[in-house]
Amino acid sequence: MGTRFLLALCLVLLVLGFEVQGAQLPQQDEQPSPALLSQVRESLSSYWESAKAAAQKLYEKTYLPAVDEKLRDLYSKSTAAMSTYTGIFTDQVLSVLKGEE
C-alpha cells in the first residue's frame, strides 16, 4: 500500500469522524408535559367510570336473588377453603425453612 492510499484513508476516516461528531445532538431529557398526563389520566378515568356504569347496569338488569344467594354461599365456602389451604401451605413452608430439629 502506498502512502497516498493511507493518507486518503486517514482523510476519509477523519471526515467521517467529524460528520459523526457533528450529527450528535445534545440529549435533552424532555419531561412529558403535565397537560398530556392529565389528559391521559382523565381519559382513563372516564373509560373506567363508563365500564363501571355498564357493569352496574348489567348487574341490576340481570339481578336474581337466588343466584345472588348462591354466589354469596360460593364465596364464603371458597374463602374458608382458601384460608385452610393457606394455613397448611404456610405450615409446610415454615417446616421446610426451619428444618428438622
UniProtKB/Swiss-Prot annotation:
<feature type="signal peptide">
    <location>
        <begin position="1"/>
        <end position="17"/>
    </location>
</feature>
<dbReference type="GO" id="GO:0016042">
    <property type="term" value="P:lipid catabolic process"/>
</dbReference>
<dbReference type="InterPro" id="IPR008019">
    <property type="entry name" value="Apo-CII"/>
</dbReference>
<keyword id="KW-0345">HDL</keyword>
<keyword id="KW-0732">Signal</keyword>
<dbReference type="GO" id="GO:0034361">
    <property type="term" value="C:very-low-density lipoprotein particle"/>
</dbReference>
<keyword id="KW-0443">Lipid metabolism</keyword>
<dbReference type="GO" id="GO:0016004">
    <property type="term" value="F:phospholipase activator activity"/>
</dbReference>
<dbReference type="GO" id="GO:0042627">
    <property type="term" value="C:chylomicron"/>
</dbReference>
<comment type="similarity">
    <text>Belongs to the apolipoprotein C2 family.</text>
</comment>
<keyword id="KW-0162">Chylomicron</keyword>
<keyword id="KW-0427">LDL</keyword>
<dbReference type="GO" id="GO:0043274">
    <property type="term" value="F:phospholipase binding"/>
</dbReference>
<dbReference type="GO" id="GO:0034362">
    <property type="term" value="C:low-density lipoprotein particle"/>
</dbReference>
<keyword id="KW-0442">Lipid degradation</keyword>
<feature type="region of interest" description="Lipid binding">
    <location>
        <begin position="66"/>
        <end position="74"/>
    </location>
</feature>
<keyword id="KW-0850">VLDL</keyword>
<dbReference type="GO" id="GO:0034364">
    <property type="term" value="C:high-density lipoprotein particle"/>
</dbReference>
<comment type="function">
    <text>Component of chylomicrons, very low-density lipoproteins (VLDL), low-density lipoproteins (LDL), and high-density lipoproteins (HDL) in plasma. Plays an important role in lipoprotein metabolism as an activator of lipoprotein lipase. Both proapolipoprotein C-II and apolipoprotein C-II can activate lipoprotein lipase.</text>
</comment>
<protein>
    <recommendedName>
        <fullName>Apolipoprotein C-II</fullName>
    </recommendedName>
</protein>
<feature type="propeptide" description="Removed in mature form">
    <location>
        <begin position="23"/>
        <end position="28"/>
    </location>
</feature>
<keyword id="KW-0325">Glycoprotein</keyword>
<dbReference type="Pfam" id="PF05355">
    <property type="entry name" value="Apo-CII"/>
</dbReference>
<dbReference type="GO" id="GO:0060697">
    <property type="term" value="P:positive regulation of phospholipid catabolic process"/>
</dbReference>
<dbReference type="GO" id="GO:0006869">
    <property type="term" value="P:lipid transport"/>
</dbReference>
<dbReference type="InterPro" id="IPR023121">
    <property type="entry name" value="ApoC-II_dom_sf"/>
</dbReference>
<keyword id="KW-0813">Transport</keyword>
<feature type="region of interest" description="Lipoprotein lipase cofactor">
    <location>
        <begin position="78"/>
        <end position="101"/>
    </location>
</feature>
<keyword id="KW-0730">Sialic acid</keyword>
<keyword id="KW-0964">Secreted</keyword>
<keyword id="KW-0445">Lipid transport</keyword>
